[in-house]
Regions:
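Glycine-rich nucleophile elbow surrounding the catalytic serine of serine-hydrolase chemistry
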Residues: 100-110
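Short, surface-exposed "cap/lid" segments of acyl-processing enzymes
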Residues: 1-45, 49, 53-57
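Active-site nucleophile loop of the alpha/beta-hydrolase fold
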Residues: 122-131
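Alpha/beta-hydrolase active-site loop
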Residues: 65-88
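Cap/lid segment of the alpha/beta-hydrolase catalytic domain
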Residues: 48-73
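Alpha/beta-hydrolase fold nucleophile elbow
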Residues: 91-102
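Boundary detector for helix-to-coil junctions that initiate low-complexity/charged tails
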Residues: 262-328
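The feature captures the conserved acid-bearing segment of alpha/beta-hydrolase catalytic domains
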Residues: 130-211, 215-231, 236-241, 245
Length: 328
């Protein structure tokens, strides 16, 4: 399924959905999920959001990468859909940007390979899929063998990038994310001989952008927000215009904002956790005080009863003494 918002410019941005997992991977969100569907106001381009069709065939699947079945390549179908929509809009393929995060970024790169001169922006994508933890669920649910020739060809991202020189691939990775660093950043370094550095570096049609953000709730999920999206799109346009120095400068400013934003989110969470903890402590103290007040109330009742008995006993003794006195 898709969500579409028409813009005023002859440009098209396509957002791809990623994993359906929520609450630390414990739950699956219902589908369809349209990533960044409300961001049409952040750009004058038309915006197309596409949910992963894998979820319709495999409802228990947490992440499908738009892979398809053993015989059908869903990414090729999606590329045909994007090209038809761009034709109707009068958008040239060089003005198509395929955009995704995590598994959506993986799909963006793959679909880009089917659309000549298009661009892909992928934030923390999975590039060496065979090493990714979700593989434990992918094969049992889909029945797709990851050693199958079609699967390997579809997910050979080295070839996709190297064989499509007219396309622009901007891969953005969080150096603070262990899983992205250990698997995908090392993959890029090994396959492309990239001398990775903090900030932006370009190798032919591939540009690598390293940022560092602590992450909320985790570094892998330290994705962009509307402000960063606008900066990323501006960096992409500078890259396409061969103004790499300008792109690198803007990326460095974006990195500062990116790091500060998630640092503030982390502090906010810590403050909230402390507030919750303090709230719990205060509640516990209030409960203790309430229990003490109950005990004191019971003691006061006992004291009142004892005083009453003492008074009654004293009056009785006085009455007996008076009777004896008057009887004499």
């Amino acid at each position: 399924e898709c969500f579409f918002n028409r813009g005023s410019a002859k440009r098209l941005v396509v957002f791809f959905s990623g994993a359906r997992t929520r609450n630390g991977g414990r739950d699956l969100a219902p589908f369809p999920t349209f990533s960044s569907w409300s961001w049409g106001s952040e750009t004058n381009a038309s915006v197309l959001c596409i949910d992963d069709p894998m979820f319709y065939n495999y409802p228990a699947l947490p992440l499908g990468w738009f892979n398809g079945t053993e015989k059908e390549d869903y990414r090729e179908y999606v590329a045909s859909l994007v090209c038809e929509i761009s034709r109707l809009l009068g958008v040239q393929t060089r003005d198509i940007t395929l955009y995704g995060r995590s598994g959506g970024g993986t799909a963006a790169i793959a679909v880009c390979g089917f659309i000549s001169e298009s661009s892909a922006v992928a934030i923390n994508p999975q590039l060496d899929i065979a090493k990714y933890p979700y593989n434990e669920k992918f094969t049992p649910i889909t029945g797709i063998n990851k050693s199958d020739e079609a699967f390997l060809k579809r997910n050979n991202f080295e070839n996709i990038i190297k064989q499509h020189k007219k396309n622009t691939f901007l891969i953005i990775s969080n150096a603070a994310s262990k899983i992205d660093y250990d698997i995908d950043i090392n993959f890029l370094s090994a396959k492309f001989g990239a001398n990775l550095k903090y900030g932006l570096s370009c190798l032919d049609n591939l540009c690598l952008w390293q940022y560092y953000a602590c992450g909320e709730p985790d570094p892998h999920s330290a994705f962009d927000n509307p402000a960063l999206f606008r900066m990323i799109m501006a960096v992409l346009e500078l890259i396409k215009a061969k103004n790499i120095d300008g792109a690198a400068l803007l990326a460095s400013f974006a990195n500062e904002y990116w790091a500060d934003r998630y640092e503030l989110l982390m502090r906010k969470r810590e403050i909230n956790q402390k507030a919750v903890s303090r709230g719990g402590e205060i509640k516990a103290l209030k409960d203790q005080i309430s229990e003490k007040e109950k005990v004191i109330s019971e003691k006061n009742k006992e004291i009142s009863a004892l005083k009453k008995r003492m008074h009654e006993s004293l009056f009785a003794k006085i009455r007996r003494a008076l009777r004896k006195l008057f009887n004499k």
